[in-house]
Amino acid sequence: DLTQEVGAVGNSLVLDRDLILANLQRVQDRNGLEVASALAGGALDFDIEMETGTGKTYVYLRTIFDLAVRYNFTKFVILVPSVAIREGVSTSIRLMREHFENLYKPQGITFDASIYSGKSAEEVQSFATSTNVQILIMTIDSIRGNANTRIIHQTRDKLNGLRPIDYLKATHPVVIMDEPQNME
């Protein structure tokens, strides 16, 4: 088991898919949306569509902390299409840190946010093994490709011969895609 091999503290939650569908239907009905009859493709993929400048980053950060409180999730990857957006998300987290600490620290939630870089790929070990909420911001290009083109897919001596992507996989992170339409 990869989770045990890397010593990962990962997300773990077993929910009945019928319960998830019922919750989705309640949310859709409450918001005047078309109510789904089934989970699309049986997957647990959910979209929140918001116009630029309407607080998207705040909404998904707040969602991260609510998932941490309600379900004890601690691993989150924010996947973005460009370095500029990655830096913008990092800045937003830094600027909103005190706000989120005021809201969630009383509930026992502390968090770390970091940017993935191939230059410091070994930092995924800290992400994987920490018991705090971990938010890792990375570009889609940092994971596209293979061992010939991306460090994340290369085995590393400092990671016990594993690849950085193995550490991320072991945590079963919630992946939030910011501007997915720009990642194709």
Language-model segments: residues:
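RecA-like P-loop NTPase motor core of helicase/translocase proteins
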Residues: D1-E184
